[in-house]
A protein has these predicted regions:
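N-terminal "arm"/small-domain region of PLP-dependent enzymes with the aminotransferase-like
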Residues: 1-53, 153
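Active-site phosphate-binding strand-loop segment of PLP-dependent enzymes
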Residues: 130-197, 208
């Protein structure tokens, strides 16, 4: 028997498969697929601070921690460099103590017999066989006692519980009966996988340790850190003290010692969650395997399953590796399983189980087999960020356009968007404005599947929730977190539907995947990346400072499985010579193994709407000084819950306009034009404008017959009254407006969602846009129609704006996106206030041209070859 005959030998398996080790789907090693829990990874990270000192000689801190947990003397515990070291220690001391023989209950972990053989002990192999469905604990007890009838007194018995490779389990009460029936034997019970069978009180003998027992326990199997090498044994104190002296000092290193203390001190729900998760996944794995004709699956309570293919070809193990890149545990080195038909598979993710079942079906039943499922999903690139406004949205649009330019049918996707900037599709669906722009970059029609969940905040803790383009209600944060659990399937279905129709997907995350307080409820960042099997680019905003600390800090919060999705870092919004950043890039790569794939510059003169409030170009402190000669001064009053502020972005690009954000009365200045934009909370924001003194300034401006434009919520504020009979936005059924226009608005449950291709205006040009608002507005005789939509229906039904002299109000978002209308309106206002009209377009807010320029800049500054290679394109 060879010592290396175990699962998890990645280099050997990769050589046989002819593949890179990281490309293998490994069922041969029984490790939680997500990797180590967060608390344990953090403990290992902290241990770095102690590697300059020797650890305690015999892991005394871990002994004390175990004693506190189990209520046993610390001297009862012996810690070692993995249970494998302790197995060999036991074999040696058993030989020294004159143990007549060692009985290894087969089939069993090969290391027991190997260690005893190396120590010179006689080894016997009573074969218990494999437990089947229907076999009772009583049957197993009788069989074991019968098999051990001729084992002499003072012999040692090695028994794994749960069994390896079978996963069969004998409850502690039955184990005690077994030990009591043969008190003349030393029972070595290996509980390496017992944590999967239940908490210690129902899975382990440690809570009532028998005198003739030695327990072997692993701290790395359940917690997915086999590379740390950490295990311990428990027995009576006198025995443990004597055996501990046989171990060399410092066999438990600083990392293993830190891991031991972290695991033993853990009071979180990690263990319960892991058991529940493993049970569900194990049942799924069993079902997948049973679905393959000719495979027999045996019962297990561990995180692995034993199965048999009696008609398996002799090279089944090798073919799984070579043809499918799948490694299982070949059990032919176990006693009683030498015919090549026995295999063990670790519990992994459901999609992994299906891949294994499909591969087995393809080998065992090639003629009847359905074609294997695709080995991977559509190629998917995902932009995540170290923060909000890191540039994810604009870069996602850039990659959509680059992929489209290179001939790929690409679609954007963002699972959940929190934004007050939304738009309407041709089907009347509401979705995030950023995803609409990304769809335009991909040259496809936007649809709500691209942004299945949209949150539009209306207070500090509440939002309107829009699912698949339709509002489902207003929710507070806690209420939404409960509701959100049911949205994950909606999000996955939306993504899968889109991905089935396109060649490549470009996903966008939200905020940062490093927000540890939000991870549990994540549906938009790493959880979405895992579902899409996306290659993730993490974007950091260098203009804010601290970008490399942010990249490394985010990486530190990611779990092992999440880190495997990271393809590279992108440093965004850089001003200067990127070559000066090379030392930082080398450091980040050395620390993480992940390369910086691009440094994108601060983008100028590319007029593409941003998603986040922090991103618009006129968010800096208001300038109240008189504008330069010939410049039209436009003040945008900013309600606290401003929405669709991108309506004004095209104005900011005009060289003859100074666009100012006004949030306080002292920011007012002497504007030529005041714009009151949309808001998600009209009544509350109107009250705030009154409290801040801004409402009075708006009224004074109107009294001087100054130009005034209200958009959506701004339209409603300008009217006589805002009625809310259903209490949609406030408890008050009626709120007085500013009284500047003869309008009365009434909120209604149904939302108006209209895409307006063309609308007539009082100017010699038309415009277009979209409407998003609750309820309707009625007008008196002094408020005349301003904009009228083209199309069917009575003219009164198609009104989307009103005018009273220099006071304009409209429900039309995006009206300034039209270059001709924007210039006509600006020149109309300029002439009226005594400024010379330009008479020609100064700026083209041509989104197509802007997207092409954006793609060119990103392509020049990002390693597209590396990204395409990662995507398999």
């Amino acid at each position: 028997m060879k010592p290396e005959a175990h699962g998890g030998d990645r280099l050997r398996m990769a050589a046989l498969a002819g593949r890179a080790p990281d490309s293998l789907l490994d069922f041969s090693v029984n490790v939680r697929p997500e990797g180590a829990p967060e608390f344990l990874r953090l403990a290992l990270c902290r241990a770095l601070d102690h590697i300059s000192a020797y650890p305690s000689p015999h892991a005394e801190e871990a002994m004390e921690a175990a004693a506190r947990v189990y209520g046993l003397p610390a001297d009862c515990f012996v810690f070692g460099n993995g249970t494998n070291e302790l197995i060999h220690l036991l074999a040696r001391v058993l030989k020294e103590d004159g143990t007549p023989c060692a009985a290894v209950i087969e089939p069993a972990f090969s290391e027991y017999a190997l260690a005893c053989g190396l120590a010179g002990l006689e080894v016997r192999h009573p074969d218990c066989g494999v437990r089947r469905d229907g076999d009772s604990d009583e049957d197993m007890l009788r069989q074991l006692l019968s098999l051990l009838a001729d084992i002499p007194a003072r012999a040692a018995v090695w028994l794994a519980n749960p069994g390896n490779p079978s996963g069969s389990f004998l409850p502690p009460a039955s184990c005690r009966r077994l030990l009591e029936a043969r008190p003349d034997l030393l029972w070595i019970i290996d509980e390496a996988f017992a944590a999967y069978a239940g908490p210690d009180d129902i899975s382990s003998l440690i809570t009532q340790l028998p005198d003739n027992a030695v327990l072997l326990r692993s701290l790395t199997k359940f917690h997915a850190v086999p590379g740390v090498r950490l295990g311990y044994m428990v027995t009576r104190a006198e025995r443990a003290r004597r055996w501990r002296r046989q171990l060399p000092a410092w066999s438990v290193n600083a990392f293993a010692l830190a891991a031991a203390q972290a695991v033993l001190a853990d009071t979180s729900d990690f263990a319960d969650r892991t058991r529940d998760e493993n049970r569900r996944r194990r049942e799924h794995l069993c079902a997948c395997l049973r679905d393959v004709p000719g495979i027999t699956v045996f019962p297990s309570l561990a995180n692995y399953v034993l199965f048999r293919c009696e008609q398996a070809p002799a090279d089944l193990y090798a073919r799984l590796l070579r043809e499918y890149g799948i490694a299982v545990r070949d059990c032919s080195n176990y006693r009683g399983m030498k015919d090549g038909s026995w295999f063990r598979a670790a519990v992994r993710l459901e999609e992994d189980h299906q891949r294994l079942a499909d591969a087995l079906r393809g080998i065992l039943h090639p003629a009847a087999s359905v074609p294997p499922r695709p080995r991977s999903r559509r190629p998917a690139l995902m932009l995540q960020g170290t923060s909000s406004d890191a540039g994810k949205s604009i870069l996602a649009a850039a990659f959509c356009r680059i992929l489209r330019q290179d001939g790929y049918d690409v679609a954007p996707f963002k699972a959940q968007n929190m934004s007050l900037n939304s738009g309407v599709t041709a089907l009347g669906e509401e979705m995030g404005r950023a995803q609409i722009v990304q769809a335009q970059a991909a040259r496809i029609d936007p649809e709500a599947l691209m942004n299945p969940v949209l949150l539009k905040p209306h207070s500090e803790t509440g939002s309107q929730v829009i699912v698949l383009g339709k509002p489902v209600g207003h929710m507070q944060a806690r209420e939404y977190f409960r509701y959100k659990a049911g949205l994950w399937q909606t999000v996955r279905d939306a993504y899968d539907t889109l991905a089935d129709r396109h060649e490549v997907m470009v996903l966008e995350g939200a905020g940062s995947p490093g927000e540890v307080n939000l991870k549990q409820h994540d549906i938009v960042n790493m959880r979405m990346a895992a579902h899409a099997q996306a290659s993730v680019l993490l974007v950091g905003d260098i203009d804010r400072g601290g970008v490399y600390a942010s990249l490394l800090g985010t990486w530190m919060t990611l779990e092992q499985q999440e880190r495997s999705l990271l393809a590279g870092w992108l440093v965004n919004k850089f001003r200067g010579d990127a070559s000066f950043l090379e030392p930082a890039h080398a450091y980040v790569r050395q620390a993480t193994g992940i390369p910086v794939l691009g440094v994108t510059p601060w983008l100028r003169n590319i007029n593409i709407p941003d998603e986040d409030m922090a991103g618009f170009p006129w968010s800096q402190a208001a300038d109240t000084t008189p504008p330069p000669p010939g410049i039209l001064d436009i003040a945008v009053v900013m309600p606290r819950h401003v929405s669709n502020f991108t309506d004004m972005t095209p104005l900011a690009a005009e060289p003859d306009v100074r666009l100012r954000a006004v949030r306080r009365a002292e920011d007012w200045g002497q504007p030529h034009v005041v714009i009151l934009p949309g808001t998600k909370s009209v009544a509350a924001d109107l009250a705030a404008l009154r409290a801040d003194g801004l409402a009075e300034l708006i009224c004074r401006h109107a009294a001087r017959d100054g130009w005034l434009l209200g958009i959506c919520g701004g339209l409603q504020m300008l009217g006589r009254a805002i009625l809310d009979p259903l209490g949609l936005e406030s408890a008050a059924p009626s709120v007085p407006g500013l009284g500047l226009m003869d309008l009365e608005s009434t909120f209604a449950a149904d939302k108006t969602l209209v895409s307006v291709r063309r609308a007539a205006t009082p100017l010699p040009v038309m415009t277009g846009g979209y409407e998003i608002h609750h309820g309707h507005t009625s007008h008196g005789p002094s408020a005349l129609p301003l904009f009228v939509r083209e199309g069917q229906g009575a003219p009164e039904e198609r009104i989307c704006g009103y005018v009273s002299g220099r006071r304009w109000a409209t429900y039309l978002h995006g009206l300034f996106d039209d270059d001709a209308f924007r210039r006509a309106w600006l020149d109309h206002v300029r002439q009226d206030v005594g400024l010379k009209p330009q008479g020609r377009q100064l700026v083209r807010c041509d989104l197509e041209a802007s997207l092409d320029r954006l793609a060119d800049v990103v392509r020049q500054n990002v390693d597209m070859k590396a990204i395409y290679k990662r995507l398999g394109l």
